[in-house]
Amino acid sequence: MASPGIEVELLGKGHSDLGEVAPEIKASERRTAVAIADLEWREMEGDDCEFRYGDGTNEAQDNDFPTVERSRLQEMLSLLGLETYQVQKLSLQDSLQISFDSMKNWAPQVPKDLPWNFLRKLQALNADARNTTMVLDVLPDARPVEKESQMEEEIIYWDPADDLAADIYSFSELPTPDTPVNPLDLLCALLLSSDSFLQQEIALKMALCQFALPLVLPDSENHYHTFLLWAMRGIMRTWWSQPPRGVGSFREDSVVLSRAPAFAFVRMDVSSNSKSQLLNAVLSPGHRQWDCFWHRDLNLGTNAREISDGLVEISWFFPSGREDLDIFPEPVAFLNLRGDIGSHWLQFKLLTEISSAVFILTDNISKKEYKLLYSMKESTTKYYFILSPYRGKRNTNLRFLNKLIPVLKIDHSHVLVKVSSTDSDSFVKRIRAIVGNVLRAPCRRVSVEDMAHAARKLGLKVDEDCEECQKAKDRMERITRKIKDSDAYRRDELRLQGDPWRKAAQVEKEFCQLQWAVDPPEKHRAELRRRLLELRMQQDGHDPSLGVQEFISGISSPSLSEKQYFLRWMEWGLARVAQLRLRQPPETLLTLRPKHGGTTDLGEPLWPEPLGVEHFLREMGQFYEAESCLVEAGRLPAGQRRFAHFPGLASELLLTGLPLELIDGSTLSMPVRWVTGLLKELHVRLERRSRLVVLSTVGVPGTGKSTLLNTMFGLRFATGKSCSPRGAFMQLITVAEGFSQDLGCDHILVIDSGGLIGGALMSAGDRFELEASLATLLMGLSNVTVISLAETKDIPAAILHAFLRLEKTGHMPNYQFVYQNLHDVSVPGPRPRDKRQLLDPPGDLGRAAAQMEKQGDGFRALAGLAFCDPEKQHIWHIPGLWHGAPPMAAVSLAYSEAIFELKRCLLENIRNGLSNQNKNIQQLIELVRRL
């Protein structure tokens, strides 16, 4: 039979030349060719070689042994110690607990160590997180204490005298310490065992590490593959957007909402070429290849996948505005299907519907593969073949490829051959050229939300479609759809945060200053009380607006999951409303934090503060403050209180991991009644486990404080100018019960000073005094204070004053000075003389500070004042955050390792009692009132 179209000579040549693109087949020729192909299809239907492909939903029904897949998943979960998390899923709070593991850089020894090793390293943004290598011959103290007894029970000791025949099968089924685990199997097992919020955290951290993200999660146990839309909701990316005409600018958006062309890479039957290696090469600019997709040449990459076949991964290329780095002019998504398309047809169908082009890697095109692809004849997607043909298969491949040309509407330029002699660099350039040609022509652009919509139509489960998530989303939309202008909404709906609150905060500051006066006039004190009462009565005269009432209903839900869903939806919904688009050069915007460039005026923010969840909680706090003030003054009977339950609601949010505002970023004051009420409720909920260590960070904006805390403890403090509120926030970390006695506390309360310390000079008057007071408050509440610096000698004057004031009170936290190199990852760290300079006797600034605090010549070197020894790890150099140029840069391994070492030292200091006396919550409440 004559082959339709133009004869394919490509396979005979053994290479593909993109420079010689054959003409497209005419419409009349294509109709004839397709008709011939239809005839051949019917002929093959009668062949005895019946072909069936898996649809991804009922694979077990087509299998003679339907329990094989089920047992394979169960064996993997059991091997990894995750079988107990199939009903009660592993939560984010579980994964963040401080334990023995937190203080040791131990290597996993048995498969059950692998999930925890992965989570711990991923939390620290460690590029080695995916490595599943286990080390058996290690020193005894290299393994966590709490797991030693467990390991002794698991190790199987073989006695040669035993009856081998009687026990060989049971022995081979038991997990052994050297059982290799493919990293993709580990990821799938962990995601299947995690709740929605831990899945989201895993995806967020993987994105920061520039790992490929799971998009479709296979579940061979229930034959329900899940599209992970919710898991990717929190991922924001920044890239250079260059319109065809006009000036380019940086754009920041969610990967879920932004649309981009998508290109899928799949395998049909077998392929000698690695899809993942090819994708990594295409995505990597210059000569530095980043292993975004795990591939066969990496450690344990050749291990058989037990449960991760059918996994679809996604990664993006984002332009930076630099010609030497930008492979493509716009964002591009790349998708990778693990496994053969014939066994995972549902996933393949999804990829063909969402992709602008699909690259099919195969060594063989026979009758089975032809019938498989023939069913795609109505598809409008572009198809490209990357072949590495078997010796002796040339004629078969040629015959069926010629049949597919009219069916898939392709020509010779859509077929590439890559064999061992093919130059890899040239081949990668060809792939990039194809992608570039598709981008220049009209092509479909899809967001992850669009992909999820296509997945639903095909019958895939979408994680976001659960009832609790959708109810929370509906509630969020009822609030945000009324927000047309953030400033107007704050003025009209959050009424207690206007002038009455600012005036009340000012009166309370004056009243507090009178407390320290030698002989304050009683008349002035009474006047301040009267003014404060008037302002509080004015606030109490309002009722919560409809939006605030809806918010209160959302956080009052009896379902913990619905409450957490609602808070996440509110964060994203409010961020979407704000639509902040900064216009800054790449070196400032893409570092996730502003440069340190002089002083900050606390009265005038450097950027507009976005409307956030903290504003709704602040409104609740003001209702509680006003009501409490009236009760204290005898103007309102305690039995008539309407808002007494508000602190309890807020304390529950703190326990779920939400950062709560400690110092108001608008008035730069602490709502004492609200904070103490919240801590009292926290004390009630924690019951016997209320011993606290307070750890704070202070320093000027732009020194990486929030990123440091988030990396160290897995916290959620806001980073970057566009989303950072100005106040100080606190988050609670739980210490595992088995470790709390050893560490000496049950929880660690972490305080991030945000943008409160602006580096004001002493000549700035009231502004400087305000900064010094705030620094004194934050450091005075703390057992441990991390001083974050942008320069080795750059200690803000306000912090020097706080040192002096705290020395007079006798309260001296354990200080750690952290110098962060914000730009150069190659700098090894400050030299010893640099460390000495930081703590040397003070110059003019220190002497002036001493005179203001009336300490005269008694001012000592900072080394003595802060109990620092430069040789004993009180001063830290943290390398740059990024390895490479953002937005395609990954987090530096040196940064991750330095943060881990700082964390280990902090915990060791707490454990050894070097962090001053630990507190319980009641003592912290008294300290808040006193300070």
From Swiss-Prot:
InterPro entries: G_VLIG_dom (IPR030383), GTP-bd (IPR006073), P-loop_NTPase (IPR027417). Residues 689-929 form the VLIG-type G domain. It comes from Pongo abelii. One of its GO terms (cellular component) is cytoplasm. Keywords: Cell cycle, Cytoplasm, GTP-binding, Nucleotide-binding, Nucleus, Phosphoprotein. Its main location: cytoplasm. It comes from the Eukaryota. SUPFAM superfamilies: P-loop containing nucleoside triphosphate hydrolases. The modification Phosphoserine is found at S3. Disulfide bonds: none annotated. It is found in: Cytoplasm; Nucleus. This is Up-regulator of cell proliferation. May be involved in cell cycle progression through the regulation of cyclin D1 expression. GO terms for molecular function: GTP binding. Belongs to the TRAFAC class dynamin-like GTPase superfamily. Very large inducible GTPase (VLIG) family. PROSITE patterns: G_VLIG (PS51717).
